[in-house]
Amino acid sequence: MCNIISQDDLIVYPDAGGYNHCMATFRVIHACCVLILLALLPHVARADDVTFRNHVMPILAKAGCNSGACHGNMNGKGGFKLSLRGESPALDLETISRSQLGRRVNLTDAVDSLLLRKATASIAHEGGKRFAVGSLEYQTLHDWIAAGAPDDNTALAKLTSLEVSPRESILIEPIASVQLRAMATFSDGTKRDVTSYVVFDLSNLLATVSAQGLVERVKPGEVTVTVRFNHLQQPARIAFVPARPNFKWSEPAAANFIDEHVHTKLKKLRMNPSPLADDSTFIRRAFLDVIGVLPTPDEARAFVADSRIDKRDRLINALLERPEFNDHWALKWSDLLRNEERVLDAKGVRAFHGWIRDSIATNKPVSQFVHDLITARGSTYDNPAANFYRANRSADVRAEATAQLFLGTRMQCAKCHNHPYDRWTQNDYYSFAAFFAPIDYKIIENNPRDENDKMMFIGEQLVVMNSKNQVKHPDGGRVMKPAFLGDAKQPAESKGDSLESLAQWMTSGENKRFAAAQINRIWFHLMSKGIVDPIDDFRDTNPPSNGPLLDALTRAFIKSNYDLRAMVKLICTSRTYQRASQPTADNEEDQSNFSHAFVRRLTAEQMLDAMSGALDAPVAFNGVPRGYRAAQIPGVAAIYRDRDPAPGDRFLRLFGKPPRLVACECERSNDTALGQVFELTSGETINDLLTHDDNRIAQMLREKKNDDQIIDELYWAALSRAPSETERGAAKSLLANVKDRRTGIEDIAWGLLNAKEFVLRR
């Protein structure tokens, strides 16, 4: 028999009775679903039942007619324009049945309607055949036209909610399909099965989905199906799990609730986690993730030799107190807050970076940090937090940046039309932007080097409030009042400070979205992938890979009073964080459930600081004091706007340091490119480090260290481990056969800096 555990958490797998019985049972269930749907077709197609908004509009969406690639395009197609994804039914009704003398519908002979003949490809149609004659789609449109293509009665019940079942499914091989069902609820309380009317979209190619909602596996993995009916959409998450007949849960130990939630899901997926990483891998990973630099050879040796069972917890505690922690996390926020010299100028960049770093050094709660940014005004020199508004110079840009950075919400689409993949409307967009309309600037001084660049400022500015500034809706020009995003509770009508009310609402413990977005960002920086991915794209149709884990982390973050260090410690002391990156046979396909560590390339700053640290030689940058590490550079001017950048500046740009023009993690690139290969193999930066007259190589030669000592030191400095016997033998052989000993040592160091193990965080 088949075991089905509730409708919202469906797990289907064959028991001891075998595959045939299970498949037979599943086919019966599927057949029954199809028969039920077919039985409904005559009912929903009756002319007296067909409505424009609840029947015709969904058909147009399902056929793709109002998509952005078709007639929902800004300019329409073939002279026929519909509102994008049906956001304006009244306009679409006019276009279909009234405009151009009603040429698209034939009220006396519905079969001859252009709307039907084009869609069935009875006549030429650039979009091809969208449905067949006699199909549900055809019959629905036919009956509506035959009834006179009427508008809906004003008393028509409105769509209020959409439910999809099952919401989550785990299908164990050989079970390879699941039938989704969509149920709509209307304002009069009626419910209707709309499975045949909804649009099904897949998040990836691991499965296929039919027009009737049958999801079938292509390969193992997890897929999200977005189910859309009119303006509402809901996700269904499905996992296709290999049979793994010999699977046995390994009962891994849990250090905290993170492990418990991760293990709960892994067990359902029949996936054992990888073992813990060895000590050398762990210390290198922890140093890079928590403070952005490599451990020194002495630090790495001491940690590996330490026999205390709590040494990993001790290490994390020590790293949290180091000054490099402040530099590392200030760098991340400087990227997101657009701390760059073109708009802020060099003095403003230094002030803003200093304020960010000081906030982290004093362990200011993240909620207070964001509150200070949202409410900031005055001189951008004297009150550096005001540079948030100096960088974002219009109400719409401020609203988009605030929503994306602090609420994990991408609002940009709703500027021009209702968001196609989220619940946000144009009203939501411009109501939220209205909070930021009063912000204005008093420019005390401006001496730009390029007077034609209207976004270049050099000189002091004041961020001030001007109550006369307004945001108007593009459709009709009505003045918008400030409104919180997705919250029935709205700011009180008053002459008070709207930004203060926004900051209080946003950072309140009741606003779980803020806390979830921030802890997801912290998780991403430590785990290399967000629980919600992309990390700033929270929406119902992009669900978290582990919802209970994200909820638990959100609660813990709020309970800690938004303590960054407490959350870093919580994550890094979990066994989930400490797992090896090498997958097992069970989890080699896993890309979202944290069964093993994810490998990624070091960031530009990490790479350059690691090279500098491994060779104990400084890198030169323009515009900062000698001895600065890459992670300590406040801005980006020398990297992106200096006519003669230093080698270190060019290196950072080549390896993906962002220009800080947008408020998004996505601006930083960790992609590989051919130019990076050339830079690492023969670039000016690596050559300067290798040949520096007082680097680690020169120091060891002065101290007359023997070959074994030199080889050991280089390996510990670059890879945080001792060389294997094979590696030691190869290095000693090289040194024995070179004329110049320093050149040979440089070759060994060059090889280590170009090794995958060096350039990757494992």
Predicted feature residues:
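Long, His/Glu/Asp-enriched segments that create or flank divalent metal/ion-associated functional microenvironments
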Residues: L615-R641, P645-L674, F678-E679
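Cysteine-centered motifs
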Residues: C2, C22, C32-C33
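Primarily short, surface-exposed interaction patches in extracytoplasmic proteins
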Residues: S250-E324, K332-G623, C666-E667, N687-I745, ...
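Short sequence/structural segments immediately N-terminal
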Residues: T51-S67, D151, A157, L319-N326, ...
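Bacterial N-terminal signal peptides
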Residues: H30-P42
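Solvent-exposed helix-loop boundary motif
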Residues: A47-Q139, A155-M183, K191-A255, S280, ...
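Short, positively charged and aromatic/hydrophobic N-terminal segments
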Residues: N3-I4, Y13, Y19
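Periplasmic/extracellular electron-transfer cofactor-ligation site
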Residues: A61-L84, D143, A147-L156, R410-Q426, ...
